[in-house]
């Protein structure tokens, strides 16, 4: 497991006074003001002075960023927080996305299907993206108990049920072409 968790990404500048768009990945975006944030290398530290909600993101003022040029230089900077600064998982079905990256993806018989590449939230719930073992296009699955019944972070694997979307099954009387 990684020592630091990706918690937000800095977007484009907002205005001319150094504010930035901020895309938060945690359940409590306002908690960003309490966390010690760093860039990916850990060398640069950030402190959120103010944070307010906007349409599909937040607008933040970061300590030491006073103008648009300084804000622009931070565009697409990922912000990390030390794992020990975050609350512990509330239950056994709660995971940090960072802990799922790189896990083996297996079917219910234990056959290797691929490797977890990413987790996405497109607004209707988390979606798991994995790279198939034999190569090819990545595959997406809803990150639900039905589609992903087993998450074994210490064991380095997840178990998936690939065909869990009944809407993709054609009706029995569908024409065969």
UniProtKB/Swiss-Prot annotation:
A GO molecular-function term, please?
Answer: ribosome binding
Give the similarity note: Belongs to the RimM family.
Stored Gene3D superfamilies: PRC-barrel domain (2.30.30.240), RimM (2.40.30.60)
Kindly list the places in or outside the cell where this protein is found, as annotated in its UniProt entry: Cytoplasm
Q: Name one GO biological process term.
A: rRNA processing
Is the keyword rRNA processing assigned to this protein? yes
Query: Subunit composition?
Result: Binds ribosomal protein uS19.
The record's GO CC annotations read: cytoplasm; ribosome
Described by its record, this protein's role is as follows: An accessory protein needed during the final step in the assembly of 30S ribosomal subunit, possibly for assembly of the head region. Essential for efficient processing of 16S rRNA. May be needed both before and after RbfA during the maturation of 16S rRNA. It has affinity for free ribosomal 30S subunits but not for 70S ribosomes.
The main location is cytoplasm
Lineage per the UniProt record: Bacteria, Pseudomonadati, Pseudomonadota, Alphaproteobacteria, Hyphomicrobiales
Which UniProt keywords are listed?
Answer: Chaperone, Cytoplasm, Ribosome biogenesis, rRNA processing
The name of this protein is Ribosome maturation factor RimM
Q: SUPFAM superfamilies under this entry?
A: PRC-barrel domain, Translation proteins
- PRC barrel domain location is 92-166
Which PANTHER family does the entry mention?
RIBOSOME MATURATION FACTOR RIMM (PTHR33692:SF1)
The source's domain of life comes to Bacteria
Let me see what the UniProt entry remarks about domains: The PRC barrel domain binds ribosomal protein uS19.
């Amino acid at each position: 497991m990684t020592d630091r968790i990706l918690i937000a990404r800095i977007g484009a500048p907002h205005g001319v006074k150094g504010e930035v768009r901020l895309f938060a990945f945690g359940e409590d975006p306002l908690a960003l003001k309490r966390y010690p944030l760093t860039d990916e290398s850990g060398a640069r530290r950030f402190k959120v002075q103010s944070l307010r909600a906007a349409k599909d993101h937040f607008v933040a003022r970061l300590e030491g960023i006073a103008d648009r040029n300084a804000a622009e230089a931070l565009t697409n900077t990922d912000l990390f927080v030390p794992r020990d600064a975050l609350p512990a998982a509330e239950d056994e079905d709660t995971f940090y996305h960072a802990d799922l990256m790189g896990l083996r993806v297996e079917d219910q018989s234990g056959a290797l299907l691929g490797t977890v590449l990413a987790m996405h939230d497109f607004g209707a719930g988390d979606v798991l993206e994995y790279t198939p073992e034999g190569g090819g296009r990545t595959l997406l699955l809803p990150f639900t108990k039905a589609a992903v019944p087993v998450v074994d972070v210490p064991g380095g694997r997840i178990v998936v049920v690939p065909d869990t979307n009944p809407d993709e099954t054609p009706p029995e009387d569908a024409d065969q072409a």
